[in-house]
Amino acid sequence: THWFIKPIMEGKYPESVFQHFINIMPTIAENDMAIISEKIDFLGLNFYSRSMIESGRQGKVSDTILRKIKRAEVRIQESNDISADDSKGDQLQKLMNQKNTHYKSVDLEEVERTHIGWEVYPEALLKLLTDLHHTYNLPPIYITENGAAVDDHVIDGVVDDEQRYRYYQNHLSMVDQAIEKGVDVRGYFAWSLMDNFEWA
């Protein structure tokens, strides 16, 4: 989160980004950060779940991180540290290995999950909002996406949607608690089937 928000709010990347991802950082032109950190009217946050990881030399870079890194392949291929004989996927993995960013995902047992396997943990939304509130001088916040994929069923003409109902109820409760703690949340947009028409 700080990878994206710190440049917007403070005009610089977190130091940890340069420590771990220096070889895949985008080229930063002279006035880029000044443009990126121009004043914004509001901050939109998409939130669905949390990810749990632990350190370990035997761990692997998560698929999510690899997908993000692949977007920077053009810049990575220009690096002299990477062999032209390796496949792109191997290049990325080797690069991450060189930077000592080994970790592995932790799949907790006996936790509620959505139909696509994401953990349901609304408390993480409260932590995100309060942490950002205490770290940055933020504009008003809008939750621009929040929701869950649920394998619901129609029973006697009625959609059995208890899990999704509970998901929204609990996450809205976290937003309410964040507001009580001083976070300036102005709006909340539930993710719905209509959102799929953006890309599906």
Regions found by a protein language model. Give the residues of each.
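Active-site region of glycoside hydrolase catalytic domains
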Residues: 1-200
